[in-house]
Amino acid sequence: PGDHWQKLANLRALLTYQITRPGKSLLFMGTELAVPSEWNHEQSLDWHLVHDPTRAAFLLFVARLGDLYRRTPALWARDGEPEGFEWIDAADHASSVLSYLRRARDDHAVVALNLTPMPRGRYRIGVPEPGEYRCILSSDESRWGGGDYGASPRVTADDIPYHGRRYSLELELPPLSAVIYVPARSRSSAERA
């Protein structure tokens, strides 16, 4: 739903959700181009869309997601194990925000999705350890076609219990977006650059 910008923002959030959930992800016939029409086996993909700057930015976002997945073991190392995924909050109906952890053996990633067209400022989520976290993805960056609302590149966990965890992060969540944070000490070679 929404205008062209909102549709692409929703699709960026959806693909981030898809790739950060357990299991293998599949892009099908034009998803990487944000093709507005349903796939039709009787015609080719709408390759002309790569000349549209918003679709070109979306294609760069999809490439970034693939690279991020490859470089962040917490997103895939324990796909087949229950310990590889943990909800932080799956029930915030009032704010329409989902948050969860993905885990490798000695690392984790924090994923938060704001599924409304309203920014969520000072949004708190519980995390498993103290220290600094770095943002390795914000789907709202202008280079992907987003609005650059301003997800913080680095944030320090507060000693404030939240969501049943001893520490918490206070995040700025852009509208219709996904953000991924990892501990600054993380071995993930993915950088938000």
Model regions and ranges:
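Carbohydrate-interacting/catalytic domains
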Residues: 2-27, 31-193
